[in-house]
A protein has these predicted regions:
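A charged N-terminal "starter" segment
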Residues: 1-2
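FAD-binding subdomain of flavoenzyme oxidoreductases
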Residues: 105-106, 110, 115-156
């Protein structure tokens, strides 16, 4: 990142807002570090596909990862795909389908229960919750098929 990009980046984050919608890893790191330093509770959110499951979460700020999406690398011959956390499962399945492939696990789609429409969520939410469908006993869970991931903690 150039010096000019760093200056623009630092001034573009308004920490007075309640919902952050970063689109880069650097923005995510900056937001998490800042909230950690100030002891601000932070809810991590994506496509809201699982927000009606479990207890309500009370946080001062929300880190919405729905803008941090996209397929970074896909090698069909290697059965390998690298994506950002906010990438919708539907986008991943669409890319795989073009090569006559599918996910090795079965992501749940709770959208039909809550809104009557499909919403299988983002890959980040699926990995975080480790939800898988009825084929889980035979083919394994989400994390069984995960080769790696990059995370962010309060120190960056």
């Amino acid at each position: 990142m150039s010096m000019e990009e760093k200056q623009n980046f630092q001034t573009s984050l308004d920490f007075n807002q309640n919902i952050f919608k970063p689109s880069t890893r650097e923005e995510i790191v900056e937001i998490v570090k800042n909230c950690y330093k100030k002891s601000i509770p932070l809810e991590i959110s994506g496509l809201q596909s699982k927000n009606k499951i479990g207890r309500n979460f009370q946080a001062e700020k929300t880190l919405d990862l729905s803008n941090y999406k996209g397929i970074i690398d896909y090698k069909p011959e290697e059965l390998y795909i690298k994506v950002k956390a906010g990438t919708p499962i539907s986008e991943i399945e669409e890319a795989l389908k073009k090569n006559n492939q599918q996910l090795a696990f079965e992501p749940n789609d709770f959208g039909y229960l809550f809104s009557g429409e499909s919403n299988s969520g983002s890959i980040g939410g699926v990995v975080a919750c480790n939800f898988a469908g009825s084929r889980r006993f035979k083919v394994g869970s989400v994390r069984d098929h995960l080769l790696g991931f990059q995370g962010v903690n309060g120190k960056g």
